[in-house]
């Protein structure tokens, strides 16, 4: 795909630490991912990056150099802990917000969104914060967690694409993730957004404090 011929709004790259050619450190000390993200940025894309927990690797040399070319970074508490070298409490909103702010300070341009099974927080370079608890799904509805992080990201990006507030974007994300939990596959549980949001209305949300 030739980026210069693409007129989409967002450039989504997933996942760092799982893309051998893009994770490779080049002769100039930069990674292929940073070079690609810089090109996307120069063409006017809003760059979005997601990390992966299955391959916790060399964050300092692979992830950190790319962050100044990232507009929005998604990660969970395990990835954030690996990136910062610090323990993060997944159900403590202050722990999540502080970690997200620390990662933002590493160079992310716009938003860091940190999510866990308890909910999600967002911090921005403009000083905005948003917090949203996850949907209180009953145990009998949960068939598997595979793909829930991807569903969360998709819900958030849909909200951003339709110019929703970040609080609303996080709500769309956690509701999309909740629907994903209802099937053991990575995507068959995901419904259209109205039905996803109905899960939040039906079961309520955790209080993330």
Could you say what each language-model-derived stretch is?
Residues 77-78, 150:
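Alpha-helix N-cap/helix-start capping motif
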Residues 106-108, 136-209:
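Conserved post-catalytic alpha-helical subdomain immediately downstream of the catalytic base
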Residues 1-72, 78-130, 135, 186-209:
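Ribokinase/PfkB-type carbohydrate-kinase core domain
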């Amino acid at each position: 795909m030739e980026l210069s011929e693409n007129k989409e709004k967002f450039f989504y790259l997933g996942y760092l630490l799982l893309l051998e050619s893009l994770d490779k450190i080049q002769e100039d000390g930069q990674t292929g991912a940073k070079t690609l993200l810089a090109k996307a940025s120069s063409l006017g894309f809003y760059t979005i990056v997601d990390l992966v927990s299955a391959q916790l690797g060399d964050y300092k040399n692979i992830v950190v150099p790319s962050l100044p070319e990232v507009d929005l970074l998604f990660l969970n508490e395990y990835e954030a802990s690996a990136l910062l070298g610090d323990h993060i409490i997944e159900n403590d909103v202050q722990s999540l917000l502080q970690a997200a702010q620390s990662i933002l300070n590493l160079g992310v341009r716009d938003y860091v969104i940190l999510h866990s099974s308890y909910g999600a927080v967002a911090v921005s370079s403009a000083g905005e914060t948003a917090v949203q608890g996850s949907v209180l799904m009953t145990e009998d509805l949960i068939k598997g967690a595979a793909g829930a992080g991807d569903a969360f990201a998709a819900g958030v990006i849909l909200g951003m694409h339709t110019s929703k507030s970040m609080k609303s974007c996080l709500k769309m994300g956690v509701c999309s993730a909740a629907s994903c939990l209802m099937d053991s596959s990575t995507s068959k549980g995901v419904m259209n957004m109205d039905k996803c949001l109905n899960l939040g209305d039906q079961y309520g949300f955790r209080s993330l404090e």
